[in-house]
Amino acid sequence: MKVISPMDDSPAGRAGVQAGDVISAIDGQNAAGLTVSEVSEKLRGAIGASVTVTFLRDGEEPREVVLVREVIKVESVTGRLEGDFGYLRISTFNENTGRELTETIERLKREKPGLKGFVLDLRNNGGGLLNAAIDVSDAFMERGEIVSQRGRKPDDIERYAAKPGDLTGGLPLVVLINYGSASASEIVAGALKDQERATVVGLTSFGKGSVQTVIPLRGGQDGALSITTARYYTPSGRSIQKIGIEPDLEVARSEAEARIVSRSSFIYSEAAYATALDSSIGAERKGPHTPHEAPGKDFDKTKDYQLQRALDVLRAGGDLSKLAAAPDTIVVTAPGTKPVETAEVDTDAPDDATPD
């Protein structure tokens, strides 16, 4: 059982649980083979009671964490100042997200007149309501399509467009994503990227771009049937399903996160599931590779390099050609470079051939 995204300010989030961590044991009992509902039942309990969970993470020893159960209060939007810039964090997309985002942007503008840009952090945001994703995208756009929803028939298309009124007045915007960003997060990132409203920084998102419809059986007496009825497409016509949103600047948050992306046996995405719906456009998700920029062993692990780089992009006015060089503690690799263990071997090369 893999963690999709730990909730902000939850016991697991505060304990350092990350997207992609695998739950291997709960209170000493092996969790292998348990269903989602069975794992949820074991994790739930009385407020104040503790549960011991063992997590597996790539390249590290099993980690045992004691979590104290509490009521989880979901705050959809938070924000703070980062120097001359505003930082906006959306943890989930619910019925309050649009209103909370508007209030947070206005508060930051009052606290710091003359703001020079915003970072919109959607990392480890597993999604939520479509309407909330549309509201968030619309908050940063003056016009243009946000997303389209397409069914099996050619004429079965529903389009959603922005209304006039960019709450930030067109200030430079950076969207942060990673492999824990899914569904509604991908709709927002895809819209703002395709409409050239934002620069996307981080790692390729999860790739959850399908629409499910729930059909009650006998009025709900016999349960319900959930079927996939459509796919989401970005304004440029790209399917989100299985492919995800690729960043304009690929940056890993930590050395450990870079290892996850480069691991041949681990692709944290919708594409990793054998039963996942195809993208429908023939495109494929990029396989394991070395992230373009990743912290090295000497990088301060308490720092958030992805956020640092997002702020660098804002300082460059959103122009990647003017971006400051990565610091010495960052490993910079050519985009798309495969890790040594997954690189293709040229079988036609002579035995005495040596690499350049």
Q: Can you describe what each PLM-predicted range is?
A:
Residues I4:
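Ligand-binding face of N-terminal immunoglobulin V-set domains in extracellular IgSF glycoproteins
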Residues D9-L34:
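Conserved PDZ fold ligand-binding element
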Residues Q18, A49, K116:
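Short acidic/polar active-site loop segments enriched in Thr and Asp
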Residues S24, E38-V77, D156, T228-T229:
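PDZ-domain C-terminal substructure recognizer with occasional recognition of PDZ-binding tails
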Residues K73, T78-D356:
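C-terminal "post-core" interaction segments
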